[in-house]
Regions:
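Ubiquitin-like/PB1-type beta-grasp interaction modules and other compact soluble beta-rich domains
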Residues: 29, 35-110, 114-134, 153-160
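Auxiliary tRNA-acceptor-end handling modules of aminoacyl-tRNA synthetases
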Residues: 83-104, 125-129, 137-331
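Intrinsic disorder/low-complexity segments enriched in small, polar and charged residues
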Residues: 11, 30-31
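Cationic, low-complexity basic patches in intrinsically disordered or flexible, solvent-exposed regions
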Residues: 9, 15, 39
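Targeting/processing segments of secretory and organellar proteins
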Residues: 4, 24-27, 41
């Protein structure tokens, strides 16, 4: 949903022009205007009070859009739905179908993961947890390994947090206050990140959900209940900030969707891809092996040589058919 607006003195916004992106489908009715927009991109006008949030705008357009909304875009900048509208602007309500909506929901899922880990393992130290292509991850400094059994335990706690529908509330602190808070919580990695930004003269932003406070610029979905379908997919080691001189952390990967059906389809796709993984097939079929002396270089086994020579013979036949001749250069 996007448009332009002009404000009256006294704090109202009138003539808000909205070409709507109804990603969720269906029609919505706006009582105060008598408008029932049905097509993506349809333009209509509404009046809203000065200071109303983007979430309230979405709700006024229909519960379908409100429930599907993840974040908004105000004059091209992605913001939380709790952001008040206090100026003439172009406003878009973004759902999971939008890339920015996906990133926001999956970023929120990483916060849910971190909160679950802190509930189960209070001694865990938090590093970073961004959204990435097709999912999210979070890095933890912990003494216990995150085994598959532990991941199942964490997932169960995440489901509890989602069910609690905890609102994500943004707030800001002065750098000194932010450092003091994270030091009190025993979060050295967060303190390091805050100190790097402290010299910019800007306040430090956090998001709070229940008892959990996270250093973060956002944006996020309104509450944890929006993370309806998720799965922790793997765990691996990762050096803090990608530097081998730093401590090795444990990175948990996951993905999240708004619908269980979409999650199931994605996980099925991953399983099918695993079946066709050349590393898996190479080992199972005895085609090649990888040795420590030559990482990344396949050493062909007898079965692999049969396949390799068959391909080379076919390559020679095709090239000969089209008039090519072979040459050889020094290796």
């Amino acid at each position: 949903m996007s448009g332009g607006a002009s404000r009256k003195p006294g704090g109202t916004v009138e003539h808000l022009l909205h070409p709507c992106n109804f990603y969720g489908g269906g029609a919505f009715f706006i009582p105060e205007t008598g408008i029932s927009p049905k097509l993506k991109g349809e333009i209509f006008m509404v009046n809203i009070d000065d200071g109303i949030t983007a979430m309230e705008v979405a709700k006024s357009l229909g519960m379908g859009l409100y429930k599907a909304a993840c974040v908004c875009r105000i004059d091209g900048e992605v913001k939380d739905l709790r952001t008040p509208i206090n100026k003439d602007c172009k406003l878009e309500i973004l759902t999971f179908d939008d890339d920015d909506g996906k990133r926001a929901l999956r970023h929120t899922a990483s916060h849910v993961l971190a909160q679950a880990v802190k509930r189960l393992y209070p001694e865990a130290k938090l590093a970073i947890g961004p959204a990435i292509d097709n999912g999210f991850y979070y890095d933890f400094d912990v003494d216990v390994p995150f085994t598959p059994e532990v991941l199942e335990k964490i997932e169960a706690e995440m489901k509890k947090i989602v069910k609690e529908a905890l609102p994500l509330e943004r707030y800001e602190l002065d750098p000194d206050e932010a450092i003091a808070m994270m030091e009190k919580k025993g979060e050295p990695y967060k303190v390091e990140l805050i100190k790097e930004h402290a010299g910019k003269g800007e306040k430090i932003s956090f998001f709070r959900q229940g008892e959990f406070d996270e250093l973060c610029a956002g944006p996020h979905v309104p509450d944890t209940s929006r993370v309806k379908a998720f799965k922790l997919t793997s765990c691996t080691g990762a050096y803090w900030r990608g530097d081998s001189d730093n401590k090795m952390l444990q990175r948990i990967y996951g993905t999240a969707f708004t619908k269980k059906e979409d999650l199931d389809n994605y996980l099925h796709m991953l399983e099918e891809a695993k079946k066709r993984d050349h590393r898996k097939l190479g080992k199972e079929l005895g085609l090649f092996t990888i040795m420590d002396e030559g990482p990344g270089f396949p050493f062909f086994l007898p079965n692999g040589m049969v396949l390799r020579n068959t391909l080379i013979d076919y390559w020679r036949e095709v090239h000969k058919r089209y008039g090519y001749v072979e040459i050889s250069t020094p290796m």
